[in-house]
């Protein structure tokens, strides 16, 4: 065995062994329990970052642990390789997205291999290949045939100068990123999938996701947003028109003083024909963004339409206002405004001098709405026949009256909107729909799939090549001329079913149901919580679509979900001569000074610039505080990086990158190597014989098996990898202090090292692989079994008993593990410290808690 730990040499040899022996390639085996471990696949941006490393290390730890449990473990990897960044890179580098993407895949693939992740590379997929997106296109046509796909107009960001659609990321301060032209909102036809048809099931089945974090489940419940309310019809005074409004608070209906409608509402557009101020307001709203997040914080503005709504119960007329906080594509595009009981309505009414009336008051007092709306549920008053009713009774009475008079209906609504899957970009899967010469829109026939995306293109940064090339769109279907759809799929489409394709990645069909149903559902899924409401919801939705197509037989795609925290690093900058911030990499910081609490108070970079320290923040390009994993692997080895990632923080919490911590992890591995090296050079011919052990030897062996029990629970059930590592470190401390003078001493250390290398194998697999062989094991560690606790070793010969006199600890005594109360009491009473504190007192009571405590009460 080499005396010195040499990570680069060891890791290269072990990785070659895994590659040559196809160690992690698996097939279905009905005789073995399966375990499917999956980390969210990466976008091939060019280089791995530490967030990737943390995600994939967690996944690899889980997969390797389950493998040593004897399970048939699938851990695949692939590339989420369509998307806008490739287009931007292609424009900047004067190339096409395809070669840029494929080069990045090769580079990042090598980085993943250097980190020693145990992937089944035979199942590798890239979503930008026709072999993958062909089946996505096929499935979309099947959804269309089932009535789950439709086309309607929807708003997009439009640059009038370039005459092109912009992604949200390409709109900067309301202007086009390329030409600085003010961006407009434009209505264009787009494709949608009816996720709302599954809203109830998606909501109800959240309750079955026992292995998912509560935070993610709450976020999904809120995103789906089920509400029970009433949809009612308001007439329009002086017009033969009406419009609908949905509310979850019909109990406040008698307090409506105005109605707010979206700028795009048909009534607003009618009124604008004779109202120039309103027409200008509508144009302004059309050109502003309409995300819910922005609506919540922007100034609430409106214009009176001159129209009046007729209250469905009182017949009273209330003004109709066009308002910028009402969206046409959300609900009915109109809201009843009750400023006495809704704060947004209150502020709007105050701003424009509209009436404010109170119709709800607390059960036990009066209501004051002079400064703010009263938004709690309470008792109705100023509400005519409904006075005195509480929320529930008021809700039902008003709903029943509206239903009886044909002016309303009870309704369950969802916040969830249908999924708009059209993107006016190039680098995505073409949407497989065609328009015939007579205007009929039909799916591309199956025998014409895949609709290939041309990869040999020139990006001009203005228009998608498949939109610019009029010839590309031309095709024929059943002998008729037709035009292809030139929009491409939202890239969330690819990531919604990739997990299932891994089960049969080379099948000449979307999924091989037998293989898919062997592996699915995923047993452990790992990824960031930022995906809770988009990817993870589409992921669940797609699984139900696959189920209803007869391709899978489970209801949910993943049993357990672990959402790992972000990786943070120190961030530094200086102000240059132009007054701009220049962010400096932590690796380029030459010296730092710290206060007595370890906080950085001064920092200077390699060029002598005095730096401003802004604290720990998420590793990012913008702050130049990302640490290249490859640099760390070359310096310390992959095992060290992996160990630090697992030890520095619980997996769900943020991890603070500290190179001092990396150095500590490296020192620990060297200590383990040194201990193993010393052991293999001892005479280890004597086999362990538990009957021959001294009490000290038994105590050490007890620590070994307590550690096995703890690490097994920490990794397998609790997924607290940091405490698992801490437990092994503590055991190592015991071993380093233990004597190595007798055959049984060496036998116990041999047993301990055999356990440690398997306990640490999921985390530091290269060094564990090597040490396992050096310890004299004939087979490789991948073929071994996880260490098993010897229950007999945990049995203690003696117990430490705390002795209290009148509630205060006065002594600690060691007794035989099977000692009875009388012998413990006799030993306790004879202790010199106890005798001292009982002097002059009469013992009134003695309480013995077996194995723990002897309590003496005396006065």
Swiss-Prot record:
UniProt short sequence motif 'KMSKS' region, positions renumbered to this chain: 618-622
GO cellular component, one term: cytosol
Top-rank taxon, per record: Bacteria
GO biological process: leucyl-tRNA aminoacylation
Reactions catalysed: tRNA(Leu) + L-leucine + ATP = L-leucyl-tRNA(Leu) + AMP + diphosphate
Chain residues that bind ATP: 621
Motif ('HIGH' region): 42-52
EC number(s) reported in the record: 6.1.1.4
Keyword Secreted: no
Entry keyword annotation includes Nucleotide-binding: yes
Location(s) in or outside the cell: Cytoplasm
One family name in Pfam for this protein: tRNA-synt_1g
Alphabetized GO MF terms: aminoacyl-tRNA deacylase activity; ATP binding; leucine-tRNA ligase activity
Keyword terms, alphabetized: Aminoacyl-tRNA synthetase, ATP-binding, Cytoplasm, Ligase, Nucleotide-binding, Protein biosynthesis
Protein family membership: Belongs to the class-I aminoacyl-tRNA synthetase family.
Protein name as it appears in the record: Leucine--tRNA ligase
Native source organism of the sequence: Shewanella baltica (strain OS195)
């Amino acid at each position: 065995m080499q005396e010195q730990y040499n990570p680069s040499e060891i890791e290269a040899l072990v990785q070659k062994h895994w590659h040559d022996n196809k160690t992690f390639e698996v097939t279905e085996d009905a005789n073995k329990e399966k375990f499917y471990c999956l980390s969210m696949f990466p976008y091939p941006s060019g280089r791995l970052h530490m967030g990737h490393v943390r995600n994939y290390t967690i996944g690899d730890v889980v997969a390797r642990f389950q493998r040593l449990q004897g399970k048939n473990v699938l851990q695949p990897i692939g590339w989420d390789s369509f998307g806008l960044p490739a287009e931007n890179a292609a424009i900047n580098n004067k190339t096409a997205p395809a070669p840029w993407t494929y080069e990045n895949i090769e580079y990042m693939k090598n980085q993943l291999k250097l980190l020693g992740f145990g992937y089944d590379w035979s199942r590798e997929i890239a979503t930008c290949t026709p072999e993958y997106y062909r089946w996505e296109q096929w499935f979309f046509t099947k959804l269309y045939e089932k009535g789950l796909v439709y086309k309607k107009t929807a708003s997009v960001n439009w640059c009038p100068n370039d005459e092109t659609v912009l992604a949200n990321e390409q709109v900067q301060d309301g202007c086009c990123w390329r030409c600085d032209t003010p961006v407009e909102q434009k209505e264009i036809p787009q494709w949608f999938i009816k996720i709302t048809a599954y809203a109830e099931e998606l909501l109800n089945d959240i309750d079955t996701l026992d292995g998912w974090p509560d935070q993610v489940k709450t976020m999904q419940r809120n995103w789906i947003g089920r509400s029970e309310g009433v949809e009612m019809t308001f007439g329009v005074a002086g017009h033969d028109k009406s419009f609908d409004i949905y509310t979850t608070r019909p109990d406040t209906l008698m307090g409506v003083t105005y109605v707010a409608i979206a700028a795009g509402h048909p009534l607003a557009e009618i009124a604008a024909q004779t109202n120039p101020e309103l027409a200008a307001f509508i144009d302004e709203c059309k050109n502003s963004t309409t995300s819910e997040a922005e609506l919540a914080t922007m100034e609430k503005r409106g214009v009176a339409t001159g129209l009046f709504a007729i209250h469905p119960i009182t017949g009273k007329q209330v003004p109709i206002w066009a308002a910028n906080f009402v969206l046409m594509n959300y609900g009915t595009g109109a809201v009843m405004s009750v400023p006495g009981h809704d704060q947004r309505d209150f502020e709007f009414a105050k701003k424009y001098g509209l009436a404010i009336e109170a119709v709800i008051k607390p059960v036990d007092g009066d209501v004051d709405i002079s400064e703010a709306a009263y938004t709690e549920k309470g008792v109705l008053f100023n509400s005519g026949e409904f006075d005195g009713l509480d929320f529930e009774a008021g809700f039902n009475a008003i709903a029943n009256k509206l239903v009886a008079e044909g002016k309303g209906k009870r309704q369950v609504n969802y916040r969830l909107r249908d999924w708009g899957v059209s993107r006016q970009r190039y680098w995505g899967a073409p949407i497989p729909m065609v328009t015939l010469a007579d205007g009929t829109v039909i799916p591309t026939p199956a025998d014409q799939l895949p609709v290939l995306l041309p990869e040999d293109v020139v990006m001009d940064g203005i228009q998608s090549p498949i939109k610019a090339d009029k010839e590309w769109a031309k095709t024929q279907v059943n002998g008729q001329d037709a035009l292809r759809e030139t929009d491409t799929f939202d890239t969330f489409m690819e990531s919604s079913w990739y997990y299932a394709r891994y089960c049969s990645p080379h099948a000449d069909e979307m999924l091989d149901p037998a293989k898919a149903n062997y592996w699915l559902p995923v047993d452990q899924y790992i990824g960031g919580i930022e995906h809770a409401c988009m990817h993870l919801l589409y992921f669940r939705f797609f699984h139900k679509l696959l189920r209803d197509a007869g391709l899978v037989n489970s209801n949910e795609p993943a049993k357990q979900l672990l959402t790992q925290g972000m990786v943070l690093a120190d961030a530094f900058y200086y102000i240059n001569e132009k007054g701009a911030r220049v962010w400096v990499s932590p690796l380029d910081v030459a010296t730092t000074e710290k206060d007595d609490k370890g906080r950085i108070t001064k920092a200077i970079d390699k060029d002598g610039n005095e730096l401003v320290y802004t604290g720990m923040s998420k590793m990012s390009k913008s702050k130049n505080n990302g640490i290249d994993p490859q640099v760390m692997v070359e310096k310390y080895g992959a095992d060290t990086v992996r160990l630090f990632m697992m030890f520095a923080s619980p997996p769900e919490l943020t991890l603070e990158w500290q190179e001092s911590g990396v150095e500590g992890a490296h020192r620990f591995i060297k200590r383990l190597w040194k201990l193993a090296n010393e052991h293999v050079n001892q005479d280890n011919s004597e086999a362990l014989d538990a009957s021959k052990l001294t009490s000290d030897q038994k105590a050490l062996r007890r620590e070994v098996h307590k550690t096995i029990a703890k690490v097994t629970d920490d990794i397998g059930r609790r997924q607290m990898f940091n405490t698992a590592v801490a437990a092994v470190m503590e055991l190592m401390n015991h071993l380093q202090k233990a004597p190595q003078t007798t055959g049984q001493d060496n036998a116990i250390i041999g047993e301990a090292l055999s356990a440690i290398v398997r306990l640490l194998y999921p985390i530091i697999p290269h060094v564990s692989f090597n040490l396992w062989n050096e310890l004299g094991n004939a087979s490789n560690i991948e073929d071994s079994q996880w260490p098993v606790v010897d229950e007999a070793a945990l049995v203690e010969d003696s117990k430490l008993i705390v002795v209290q006199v009148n509630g205060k600890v006065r002594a600690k005594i060691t007794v035989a593990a099977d000692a009875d109360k009388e012998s413990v009491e006799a030993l306790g009473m004879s202790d010199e410290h106890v005798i001292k504190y009982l002097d002059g007192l009469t013992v009134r009571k003695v309480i013995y808690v077996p194995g723990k405590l002897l309590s003496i009460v005396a006065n």
